């Protein structure tokens, strides 16, 4: 049996007690500045039926811009209005921000002044240093910058108060349109701003990103990798610097050369997430205090003396007494951009240097190689010019590589391709993208510490077809990278959502199962160990890792650490050579052909169709007398009536009356009378709605009633399904776990895909993810009825049917 998942425990995002128990805790990612709650989303596989009534198609930026110019009005964004709803969702703030357009804030506003660069970014009073650190990295790659920030925008030519920015969003690029109203206090920007008072590209980019996630507050706290990926569509690798490879400097250098984005941070040993208020202090009052203390003089373009005071300037994120700045000037729990690597000749020796930037635009490293370090005088003047050394408080500074790896704990690298940074070769990689979801009670099975449910997680077959082209490597190996990303958790924070702890495992598929797209069952995972897996389960938006495995067929199982956690994800697989990656989906089918009893016009026709038969006109019900005289024996029955059959006949006669047919109310009485005599089956009986569905299943002439023969057919089915139910009701509670419903449905001869299993769970499980006997039978009745109806219409057997509106409504309304 595979071993239990073990994972190292990284610093937690908040001060909270560990849960007791033998299962090892997953690693926790240190979100740079905030926390959140936890909630399950609402999933419906048939939500698309509501799409036509949601609204008209969104207009493009060009259409909106043109319309505003024609009407000579300034654009106001109805989806992200300039009011409190776009700012914060958790509480009402005690001060009121004034929304102003740039021409109302200053004279001669400009979108970009002398090119967008990293010194244009100064953090405001929102805990989104992770986002701003990524912007600083983005400015180092002009090609990427122009993709995210279209430069044909202006406050002068064709100005209409409308701007747009582009972000990579879960596999596709989206255009986010905003108005240019920005929150201010005392006529100063509250959030991100530029060193130039009249430059606004960074503030507007932040607003567009806030709209993408639902509010400004949603940007509070995160990891730099999130924004890096949203700017590039790249794939991120995450390094714990203390456990990093010996050639880390080489890796960082190659990242710079290839245009990769890099960020770093220092774990906060206080267990307080940076950017959150201390216990007992209201966050609204805290930010209000900060905003009121903003020093307007900081917005002048004149240089500031960085050594004038040991106190941090008043334009801060948190009050000085709550900051986590160290004596060396670095800040714990804070995101920095890595903006350069170099080497300098110092006293006859080469010294490796790293250039970093604090998104605050101030508060810098004060050790060796800092701006004001006295030994810069020993460096050649031309070298200093090449390194752009300046004594300015702009948040950017140099430090030695040795000091960097000593003080910093995390390094995040967003690669624009999946090429390994240890390699000197650039490859053309193939990528496959699969979207999926974990649905509570059906496909949210948790990690392999939970063997009863792990197998229910979504599964993705990966076929590695060709080995790598590496003449120096004698192994027959395929290199690939797997990246699992959870979707929309930040946007759903206002609903209580937080990042799940996620990871994945990779299993090799036995040769005899190659090409078989069936979902691997529980026993497979009980007796087969994984060939590879993510290094750890961690609460980051994306988990990625490189692997080298022989050509073969594998299955990737993405999961949350705990079961029953519902969410969406995308799974990306990058490989040097051709690969095939697709979700495992069972073929929808039913085991044995059953008589198809269904007509397209119930009111006027009386047809009974078989799977391999032509329809027979005029074949209807026999009279009650004939049915009673010569009942058709059921499979497995003897000629002589059993005690149960005699009991049925007597009860049926008592309830049915002279016409020997029963309606839904009468069927309920018959079934519940018989079921109650089965003491080994705990059930509250059948509901009227279930009985109506049963009649719809067995009714051959649209009368809305069942005769004795039809009732016998129905009861035999219920008995067969009852055996399946009792098999999975292991604790004899009268319910089965929704995760077992997949196997129960399969045992009954119905083979469905993952989407249909999800629908069954949503439709028939209770809030505890249990399914009682009545719901169980009702589900099977509906399944059999739908399969019968489909086969009745699928006259040519090609698996496709065409219905007119009358047939469709008849099919769905009487079922």
Curated annotation (Swiss-Prot):
This is Calpain-3. Residues 587-649 are annotated as: Linker. SMART domains: calpain_III, CysPc, EFh. PROSITE patterns: CALPAIN_CAT (PS50203), EF_HAND_1 (PS00018), EF_HAND_2 (PS50222), THIOL_PROTEASE_CYS (PS00139). Residues 616-628 have a biased composition (Basic and acidic residues). The keyword Calcium applies. Its EC number is 3.4.22.54. One of its GO terms (molecular function) is titin binding. Gene3D superfamilies: 2.60.120.380, Cysteine proteinases, EF-hand. Ca(2+) 3 binds at residues 729, 731, 733, 735, 740. It comes from the Eukaryota. The active site is at residues 129, 334, 358. Belongs to the peptidase C2 family. Ca(2+) 2 binds at residues 699, 701, 703, 705, 710. It holds the Pfam family Peptidase_C2. Residues 629-639 have a biased composition (Low complexity). It is an enzyme of class 3 (hydrolase). Residues 650-815 are annotated as: Domain IV.
């Amino acid at each position: 049996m595979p071993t239990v998942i073990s994972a190292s425990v990284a610093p937690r995002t908040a001060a909270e007690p560990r849960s007791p128990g033998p299962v090892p805790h997953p690693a926790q990612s240190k979100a740079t500045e905030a926390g959140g709650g936890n909630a399950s989303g609402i999933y419906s596989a048939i939500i698309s039926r509501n799409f036509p009534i949601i609204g008209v198609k969104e207009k493009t930026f060009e259409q909106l811009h043109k319309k505003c110019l024609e009407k000579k009005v300034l654009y106001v964004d109805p989806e992200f209005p300039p009011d409190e709803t776009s700012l914060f969702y958790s509480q009402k703030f005690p001060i009121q921000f004034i929304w102003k357009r740039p021409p109302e804030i200053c004279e001669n506003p400009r979108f970009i002044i002398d090119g967008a660069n990293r010194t244009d970014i100064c953090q405001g009073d929102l805990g989104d240093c992770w986002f701003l650190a990524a912007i600083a990295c983005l400015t180092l790659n002009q090609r990427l910058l122009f993709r995210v920030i279209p430069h044909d925008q202006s406050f002068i030519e064709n100005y209409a108060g409308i701007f747009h920015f582009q972000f990579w969003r879960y596999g596709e690029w989206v255009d986010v349109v905003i108005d240019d109203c920005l929150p201010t206090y005392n006529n100063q920007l509250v959030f991100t701003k530029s060193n130039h008072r009249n430059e606004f590209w960074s503030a507007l980019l932040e607003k567009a990103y806030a709209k993408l996630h639902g509010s400004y507050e949603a940007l509070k706290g995160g990891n730099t990798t999130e924004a890096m990926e949203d700017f590039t569509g790249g794939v991120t690798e995450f390094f714990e610097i203390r456990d990093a490879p010996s050639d880390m400097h080489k890796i960082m250098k190659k990242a710079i050369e290839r245009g990769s984005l890099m960020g770093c941070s220092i774990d906060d040993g206080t267990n307080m997430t940076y950017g959150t208020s201390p216990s007992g202090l209201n966050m609204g009052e805290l930010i209000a205090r900060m905003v009121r203390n903003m020093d307007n003089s900081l917005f002048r373009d004149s240089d500031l003396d960085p050594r004038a005071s040991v106190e941090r300037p008043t334009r801060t994120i948190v009050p000085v007494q709550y900051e986590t700045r160290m004596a060396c000037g670095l800040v714990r729990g804070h995101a920095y951009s890595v903006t350069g690597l170099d080497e300098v000749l110092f006293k006859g020796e080469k010294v490796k240097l790293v250039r970093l930037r604090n998104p605050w635009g101030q508060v810098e490293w004060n050790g060796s190689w800092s701006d004001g370090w006295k030994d810069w005088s020993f460096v050649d003047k031309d070298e200093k010019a090449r390194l752009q050394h300046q004594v300015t408080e702009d948040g950017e500074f140099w430090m030695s590589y040795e000091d960097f790896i000593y003080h910093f704990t995390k390094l995040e690298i967003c690669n624009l391709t999946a090429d390994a940074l240890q390699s000197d070769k650039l490859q053309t990689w193939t990528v496959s993208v699969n979207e999926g979801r974990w649905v509570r009670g059906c496909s949210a099975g948790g990690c392999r510490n939970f063997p009863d449910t792990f197998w229910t997680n979504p599964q993705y077959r990966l076929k590695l077809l060709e080995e790598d082209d590496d003449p120096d490597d004698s192994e027959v190996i395929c290199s690939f990278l797997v990246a699992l990303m959870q979707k929309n958790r930040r946007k759903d924070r206002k609903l209580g959502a937080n990042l799940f702890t996620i990871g994945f495992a990779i299993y090799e598929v036995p040769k005899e199962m190659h090409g078989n797209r069936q979902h691997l069952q529980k026993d497979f995972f009980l007796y087969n160990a994984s060939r590879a897996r993510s290094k750890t389960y961690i609460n980051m938006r994306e988990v990625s890792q490189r692997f080298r495995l022989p050509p073969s067929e594998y299955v990737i199982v993405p999961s949350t650490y705990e079961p029953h956690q519902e969410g969406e994800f995308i799974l990306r697989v990058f490989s040097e050579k051709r690969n095939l990656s697709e979700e495992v989906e069972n073929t929808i089918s039913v085991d044995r052909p059953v008589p198809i009893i269904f007509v397209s016009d119930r009111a006027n026709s009386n047809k009974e169709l078989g799977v391999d038969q032509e329809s027979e006109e005029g074949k209807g019900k026999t009279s009650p007398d004939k049915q009673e005289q010569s009942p058709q024996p059921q499979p497995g029955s003897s000629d002589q009536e059993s005690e149960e059959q005699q009991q049925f006949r007597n009860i049926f006669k008592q309830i049915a009356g002279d016409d020997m047919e029963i309606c839904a109310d009468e069927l309920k009485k018959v079934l519940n009378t018989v079921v109650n005599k089965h003491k080994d089956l705990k059930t509250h009986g059948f509901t009227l709605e279930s009985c109506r569905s049963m009649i719809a299943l067995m009714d051959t002439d649209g009368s809305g009633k069942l005769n004795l023969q039809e009732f016998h057919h129905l009861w035999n089915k219920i008995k067969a399904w009852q055996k399946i139910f009792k098999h999975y009701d292991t604790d004899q509670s009268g319910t089965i776990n929704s995760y077992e419903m997949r196997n129960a449905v399969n045992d009954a001869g119905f083979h469905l895909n993952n989407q249909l299993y999800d629908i069954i769970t949503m439709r028939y499980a209770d809030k505890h993810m249990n399914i009682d006997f009545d719901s169980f039978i009702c589900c099977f009745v509906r399944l059999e009825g739908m399969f019968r109806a489909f086969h009745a219409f699928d006259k040519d057997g090609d698996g496709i049917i065409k219905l007119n509106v009358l047939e469709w409504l008849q099919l769905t309304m009487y079922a």
